[in-house]
Structures are given as C-alpha cells and as structure tokens.
Amino acid sequence: MQSEISSFINYITVEQGLASNTQSAYRRDLETFAKFLDARKVQASEVSRELVREYLVELLQDRKLNARTVGRVLVTLRNFFQFLVFDRDLCENPCLNVEGPKATKTLPKVLSVNQVDELLSQPDVTKTYGLRDKAMLEVLYATGLRVSELTSLEVQAVNSDLGYVSCVGKGGKARVVPLGRSALSALESYLRHSRLALLKGKTSNWLFLNRHGEKLTRQGFWKIIGAYGRKAQIGIPLKPHLLRHSFATHLLQRGADLRSVQMMLGHSDISTTQIYTHILKERLREIYEQHHPRS
C-alpha cells in the first residue's frame, strides 16, 4: 500500500496544493491504516465497507480516539480511495455510505483575562529566551493566530509602523490581523535584542527562532507554552489553541462584531466563528447562577 500512499500524497501536494501539515496528517492516518491491513494480509484493492467500519470501531473502542478524530480519519480514507478509483481503476470507494461516529459538541475552553495576564507575565524578559517567549505569547493572544501560522511568520510579515501582521492560513489564504501595543512592544524588544543573539551571526527570514538560530517548530512552541501554563498554575493543560479561543471570546465580550472576528481568525465559514457566541452564553449563565438571588 506504500506506493498508493506515496502517489496520493504527491497528488494532494502537486494537484491540490494542500498545506504540509495537512499532508502530514493524511500520511499518518494512511500509515496507521496500512498497518491495520498488513495485520490482516489485505491489499488496498480488497478493502470492503465492512472492513472500514471494523477499523473505525477499533479506533473508537480499542485505541480510545474521540469521535471527531475518527471522523477525520474517515475523511482521509474516503479521499484516498476516491483517488484510487480515478488513478488505479479501483472498482468502487469502500468508504462511500460509511457514516462516521457522531461527535458530541463540546465548547472550547477559554482563559479569563486575569489568567491571560498571569500567563503573559511568566517569561523572564531579562533573558534571551524570555524575550522571545514573551513576544510569541503576546502575538498569539493579540492576533488569535494558529500555532502553525505563528511559527511560519517571517520578519517582513510584521508592519510595526501600521501595527499589523500578515499571515497565510489554511488553504493558502492570506490575511492581515492588527497588533496591539503590548504585542508590538514585545516584538520590538525581541527583534532588537533576543533575535540577534539567537541568530549567532547567521541569517534567517523566520521571525521566531530556536536556540540553533533556526525556525522554531510547532512542537517546540507547544513545549514552551505548556511549561509557562504549568508555571502560571492555570489549572488546565495549556495548548496554543486555548489562546486563540480566548482571543475570539474576549473580543466578542467587548462588543466586537462576529464578521470582524471571523476575518481575524481566518474562518472561511462564519458558522465556525459562531461557536464563540455559545461560549459567551454559557459564561453568562454561570454568572447568573452564581450571583442572582433567585437563580
């Protein structure tokens, strides 16, 4: 099945122009499925609907993956087999008419403004890494960028004079997001002092660098933000998307309109942004129940 996987990845890269993170996710899903087939000595051309359903059940029950993740795996398999129908003359797509598990709608967690303030105060700005980390956290909260967008920023993406950052999001769509005073100040300090120290005489277009003077990876940033979350004693595992959720929720709490928040987040569909209005409703209910005498 390896040759089919390679052909498919090449197709989504060259023909569809999917982002490298999407390519990696597709490859991981397919490599795992290939091991499942190898254990049963089944070729890709021999996969049936029943076998696909069996695999999904295994992911849910044995590997304890959540319904949303399993649904994403099914999309990967459906696209892969549809490619084989056209490219390898497969008779039919075994994933057609296979329904994924129903995902329960859970509202994303958000930090309070006080929790964000506590988090942003953690980096030691007297040190090289602290200046960098302070700038990254400030920019992440100021813009609501995805972590992949943040780590892919180049120096020229920042316009300090006009106060905005340009990024490229999902599907290669470019957008411009404003930067607040705190983020601009942290960036200025980082660029003037910390980044030069990290470069160690080398040159790089990437905005945020690791200790080798190279582009900071998503995984590297996850470790950094997780460590600061534990240090701030926030009480929940701190992941980069938590600041993105907090960014959107805090804007709406202060009267921002949904369409503007959608544009800043880079959502193609406003229904994706509307999840944050549900968070506000839940928060209002909590406040009411805690403080109203007849709640």
What residue spans do the PLM features occupy?
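Conserved catalytic core of the tyrosine transesterase superfamily
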Residues: 1-295
